[in-house]
Amino acid sequence: MAFELSEDQLKTAENELKKYLPMSQQVYGFLVIRNRVRSDPVRVLVDRWPQFRVIMCKPHGEQKSDLFKDALLFATDAAVLEEILSKSSVFDWSKYFCVGTSVSHTEIFKAVASAKGVPCKRVAKCYLMTLEDVSRLPPVDSSGISVSSLDESHIGLVNQTWKFGKVDVAVGLIRNMIANFPSCCVLDAEGKPVSWILTYASGAIGMLYTLPEHRGKGYAKILVSSLAKRNHALGYPVYSFIGEENAVSYRLFANLGFTEDPSYREAWFVVNEFQIFP
């Protein structure tokens, strides 16, 4: 039903996914980075080759912390997707997992979960916002501000402020992001981060946060602009997912030149959430 791609096939799949942008953005972005950076092990599976209809990026679940690293999925054929979810062993529906994919697959996930008798819910629904031309970023004044990158000593701080964090199993995800992908932060006079933004394994930028006592100083604008330029220079796509309820972040990214694709929404589905959040 599904088989794993080789290193050479991953490069071919990256080029193939460009044809389906923006719908394939997250899986495409993941392969762009995966083909250039070696981080945590991930299996990339397809239903057939080379004309695949379903492609999935699935982290290894060797440790409990690995379960918090989302699987990513892109499909051009809903019927094939439903068959794979229902009949293959790609996902163990008796355990916790989270999948990021198109919101258009909502009914498929609900139906398969219902048939298997397990709880499944959508935990996020987001706008896809991309920056097509980095050179058109508006100028930002960072004079007198210390901008750096996050390091491993900052994992706990990021985890405690991320809305999906505050649990031990999120630490592995954040550690992987800080160790392997670009990040930016503003440091105070004592060298401690007061505002930061990270890059996910898919290339999406996010986890943007500023400590309450440092808000209103323009730090978020500086960090989004800085990380966008850094990722672009590395050849990564520059984009972000903004929750539909997050009007503040939407305005920030829009004012920096990011544009929303009105035809597409990304969603995250969680199965057996009680195993992580009892």
PLM regions with names:
Residues 1-26, 125-126, 133-169:
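Short amphipathic alpha-helix that is part of the acyltransferase structural core
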Residues 34-52, 67-71, 175-185, 204:
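A short helix-loop-beta-strand connector motif used in the catalytic cores of GNAT acetyltransferases and
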Residues 41-42, 48-145, 149, 267-269:
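Acyl-donor-binding surface of acyltransferase catalytic domains
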Residues 51-52, 192-194, 248:
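Glycine-rich acetyl-CoA-binding "A-motif" of GNAT/NAT acetyltransferases
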Residues 78-88, 216-232, 250-251, 255:
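Conserved acetyl-CoA-binding loop-helix of GNAT-fold acetyltransferases
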Residues 104-118, 244-262:
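Conserved active-site alpha-helix within GNAT-family acetyltransferase domains
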Residues 166-213:
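A conserved beta-strand-loop-helix scaffold within acyl/acetyltransferase catalytic domains
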Residues 207-222, 234, 244-247:
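Conserved glycine-rich acetyl-CoA-binding loop
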